[in-house]
Amino acid sequence: MSRKKRYFKTVILNDPKFGSYIIAKFINYIMNNGKKNLAQKIFYYSISIISIRLNKNPFILIKKILYNVQPNFEIKKKKIGGSFYKIPIKINLKRSLMFSMKWIVKNSKLRNENGYKNKLVGELIDSYYNNSLSTKQKDELNKIIDQNKAYSNFKI
């Protein structure tokens, strides 16, 4: 019998404004040092600016932005016969959303604008139009996947 305690997944509550699990996860990725209130203010500010600029529903905009950035495959390395191969693996929706949110947050921090709010707004608008660093990162991943399609029959 195992002596370890069972791990129970923490339940993430939907965000208060839109009632969406996806937006609550996005806010959690933005959050730094446990300051969720600040992360919510940053996210809702950036969403309001984007919806004003593009004249569209903010919830639909976020779904479209995440769809533009999310990958369908992931690369894993496996050692076969003394050499490592990059093997493309299809991933589920939750994992692809996780990658897209992480990429957007990471690449928004690299932008050259004043304040994180403006950086996030710029990255989200560029992601909507497929011009952002996040979409370029997705395209680079797709190139690697195309190069290594021959190894897709290997099991991990």
From Swiss-Prot:
Underlying gene: rpsG
GO cellular component labels: small ribosomal subunit
Pfam families: Ribosomal_S7
One MF annotation (Gene Ontology) recorded for this entry: structural constituent of ribosome
Lineage: Bacteria, Pseudomonadati, Pseudomonadota, Gammaproteobacteria, Oceanospirillales
Record keyword Protein biosynthesis present: no
Function text: One of the primary rRNA binding proteins, it binds directly to 16S rRNA where it nucleates assembly of the head domain of the 30S subunit. Is located at the subunit interface close to the decoding center, probably blocks exit of the E-site tRNA.
InterPro entries documented for this protein: Ribosomal_uS7, Ribosomal_uS7_bac/org-type, Ribosomal_uS7_CS, Ribosomal_uS7_dom, Ribosomal_uS7_dom_sf
The protein's name: Small ribosomal subunit protein uS7
Keywords: Ribonucleoprotein, Ribosomal protein, RNA-binding, rRNA-binding, tRNA-binding
HAMAP family to which the protein is assigned, alphabetical: Ribosomal_uS7_B
Family according to the record: Belongs to the universal ribosomal protein uS7 family.
Single Gene Ontology BP annotation: translation
Subunit organization: Part of the 30S ribosomal subunit. Contacts proteins S9 and S11.
PANTHER family: RIBOSOMAL PROTEIN S7
Species of origin: Carsonella ruddii (strain PV)
